[in-house]
């Protein structure tokens, strides 16, 4: 295994830290000029550059993760339209959503695709909304009414303690 210097970070690294993207005439592997770490940073920066690039990535990832039993008819353009219609705010909390991707896991305020009626196995334009990642985790399979009931009870209990 040889070493190669990344043109982005300037670090000399083992070639296993580079993506192979071609073969040389002698049959040996050819590697990209940018290491995998720098390439990932570049991709994440691009994905995080606008809400639309972020939502396009979310659409692609979400569609491929869903069960084959689920109907998926929304497009990335539908998500872009939802972002605009909602003014970049979470449909349930009204909080401004973020769209950052840095490779360090889920972000509390990032936009997330939520099925309005989780009992229906459909991702259609009329059954999805954009919410923050945290709100989507809290809602899970609950109806909106049941989620709000839980929230009111949590607040009532908290107010009694204060």
Predicted regions and their residues:
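Polybasic, low-complexity binding patches
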Residues: 100-105, 110, 116-129, 137-162
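Active-site-adjacent loop/helix surface patches within enzyme catalytic domains
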Residues: 93-97
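Short recognition patches in nucleic-acid-associated and regulatory proteins
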Residues: 11-27, 98-119
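Contiguous alpha-helical segments
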Residues: 1-92, 124, 137-138, 145-159
